[in-house]
């Protein structure tokens, strides 16, 4: 790296005898004396000024800059002055993930990160600032997986800023930084009797939704978006290819989560329930935008529709139909007249997926197969959520031996 230090208080000129002589400049005694200059990787000259008696510091700064450039860790001082919010907004706009995911990231950053660290220049970030950020979240009673998601978004922004040369290293990577703690709440699956009770308490037109959720493991958006041509009654399989999701209040058709289409076994009991349902409630042709609100209109013949032959809006369904069924089944209390139902996050329609997974695992199905049926990103995720539901090896051994010796004794 080519660099040099300019003394702005003195200049060198040739004297009468032709020898170089140092003379004071018109700036002598005013302002910062030394200006260290170098040419950055992009060919642009950069500089930093130092006061009188700090020429050695200017030399050290040039040496540090040269070392950073040789290691590929050079940070443009002007880029380092970009604030976290300025960079994060550009980063969000450049993400290629689905629109709903981007909206979620933007919402978390705007609500919780920008007010706390948005104005901080990227080049000034140190581990202490991230530790303070995490503590602020905890002090404001923002915790659990939601706080972990906020932290993950902040870390991703800072990681991209490192890649783009705005800071030398990600402060979130420091050993002293700990992400927000997440309590390891275990999934407690419903009993078969509870599944039946909730099903029986729903209006007749919605009961087969419980069969699909508990018997095929679909997510709520996948159940609501289940089309007639996805159900293969003759081959005993169900193709999960579409879901209905809301993008800023607009319903759209979209691929399943993670764009992972999948085939799942269709139990005969679920197939029967769907046949009976479609006899009473024939599939309804629905047109919605594809993936985003301004996407092309796409038509699907949906198996489940509301009383007006429109899509089942999950917000209305969850409050007015699902919670009423939960209360009737004794899973949540019945509210006083005029009062809303209690929060029932652990008893949402996702509970049907938990029931489905627990039944398969108890029957000895492999984690890999269950992961594929559920549409998880990888089996490790399935294992983290459901490992405690897997029968122990000793329990499996007892079952096998009881079957063998029980049969032998009976014969």
Where are these regions (language model features)?
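Basic, Lys/Arg- and aromatic-enriched nucleic-acid-binding interface segment
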Residues: 144, 148-152, 163, 167-226, ...
């Amino acid at each position: 790296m080519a660099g040099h230090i300019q003394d702005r208080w003195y200049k060198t000129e040739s004297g009468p005898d032709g020898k170089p002589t140092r003379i004071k400049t018109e700036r002598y005694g005013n302002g910062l004396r030394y200006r260290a200059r170098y040419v950055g990787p992009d060919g642009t000259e950069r500089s930093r000024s130092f006061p009188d008696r700090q020429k050695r510091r200017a030399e050290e700064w040039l040496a540090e800059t040269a070392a950073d450039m040789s290691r590929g860790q050079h940070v443009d001082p002007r880029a380092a002055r970009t604030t976290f919010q300025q960079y994060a907004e550009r980063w969000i706009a450049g993400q290629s993930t689905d629109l709903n995911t981007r909206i979620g990231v933007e919402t978390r950053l705007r609500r919780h990160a920008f007010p706390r660290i948005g104005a901080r220049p990227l080049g000034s970030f140190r581990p202490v600032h991230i530790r303070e950020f995490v503590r602020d979240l905890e002090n404001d009673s923002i915790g659990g997986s939601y706080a972990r998601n906020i932290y993950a978004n902040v870390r991703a922004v800072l990681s991209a800023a490192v890649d783009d040369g705005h800071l030398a290293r990600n402060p979130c990577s420091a050993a002293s930084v700990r992400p927000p703690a997440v309590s390891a709440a275990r999934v407690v699956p419903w009993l078969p009797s509870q599944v039946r009770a909730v099903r029986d308490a729903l209006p007749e037109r919605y009961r087969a939704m419980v069969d699909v959720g508990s018997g095929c493991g679909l997510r709520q958006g996948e159940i609501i978006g289940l089309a007639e041509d996805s159900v293969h009654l003759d081959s005993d399989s169900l193709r999960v290819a579409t879901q209905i999701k809301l993008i800023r209040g607009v319903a759209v058709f979209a691929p399943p989560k993670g764009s992972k289409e999948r085939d799942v076994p269709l139990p005969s009991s679920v197939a029967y329930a769907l046949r009976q349902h479609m006899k009473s409630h024939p599939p309804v042709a629905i047109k919605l935008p594809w993936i985003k609100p301004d996407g092309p209109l796409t038509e699907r013949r949906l198996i489940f529709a509301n009383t007006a032959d429109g899509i089942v809006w999950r917000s209305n369904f969850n409050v007015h139909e699902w919670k009423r069924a939960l209360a009737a089944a004794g899973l949540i209390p019945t509210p006083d007249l005029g009062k809303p139902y209690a929060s029932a996050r652990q008893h949402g329609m996702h509970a049907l997926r938990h029931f489905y997974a627990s039944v398969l695992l108890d029957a000895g199905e492999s984690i890999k197969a269950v992961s594929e049926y559920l549409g998880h990103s990888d089996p490790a995720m399935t294992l983290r959520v459901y490992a405690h539901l897997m029968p122990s090896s000793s329990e499996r051994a007892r079952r096998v031996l009881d079957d063998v010796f029980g049969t032998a004794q009976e014969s």
